[in-house]
A protein has these predicted regions:
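RNA substrate-binding interface of SAM-dependent RNA methyltransferases
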Residues: 1-56
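Short, glycine/charged-enriched secondary-structure capping and boundary segments
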Residues: 5, 70-73, 92-94, 117
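A short acidic, often aromatic-flanked loop/helix-cap motif at beta-alpha or helix-coil junctions
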Residues: 36-43, 63-65, 108-109
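Active-site/ligand-binding-proximal alpha/beta "capping" segment
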Residues: 55-91, 100-102
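Structured adenosyl-cofactor binding patch, chiefly the S-adenosyl-L-methionine
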Residues: 88-150
Length: 151
């Protein structure tokens, strides 16, 4: 994305986050930040891993299913690629930086639904159930050209 399309996409995601937060009765509104490159995202993965944050990259061909991970209540960074997938080079860079490459299940979901489905699955498997927690440092939900901060 370039130029006006960046601002339009960011505004769209900000509206989605705002409405989803209202609907789920969140006590705070996550931030929607600027786009990042794969290189910047890999740096974020490396930094986050050092800080005890886990980055998950959804990839339909990954050997490890999301449900097989041990969720230890760390903050998560979730990366969802575009329709057509994340390139092998991007997967290699993110994996080398410490990200876990996982698949959501046997079915391939659209980009717009894969992120929310993965967040719900991660929430379920983390053992937090429906418990509400105090605001923690916001972490990004990444959809290739879009970076939205999410807890």
């Amino acid at each position: 994305w370039e130029g006006a399309k960046v601002a339009k996409g960011r505004d769209r995601w900000a509206a989605v986050v705002r409405e989803a937060s209202k609907q789920s009765v969140r006590p705070w509104l996550p931030d929607v930040l600027d786009l990042v490159t794969t290189k910047q995202l890999a740096r974020l993965a490396s930094t986050d891993q050092a800080e005890g944050v886990r980055m998950l990259v959804l990839e339909p061909t990954a050997a490890t299913p999301l449900s097989a991970l041990d969720f230890d209540r760390r903050d998560l960074v979730l990366v969802v690629g575009p329709e057509g997938g994340i390139t092998p080079q991007e997967l290699d860079a993110l994996s080398a930086a410490g990200a876990d490459i996982v698949r959501l299940g046997d079915e391939v979901l659209r980009t717009s639904t894969a992120g929310p489905a993965a967040l719900g699955a991660a929430h379920l498997h983390s053992g937090t159930g429906g418990a509400r927690r105090a605001r923690r440092r916001a972490r990004p939900l990444v959809m290739r050209e879009t970076l939205s901060w999410y807890p």
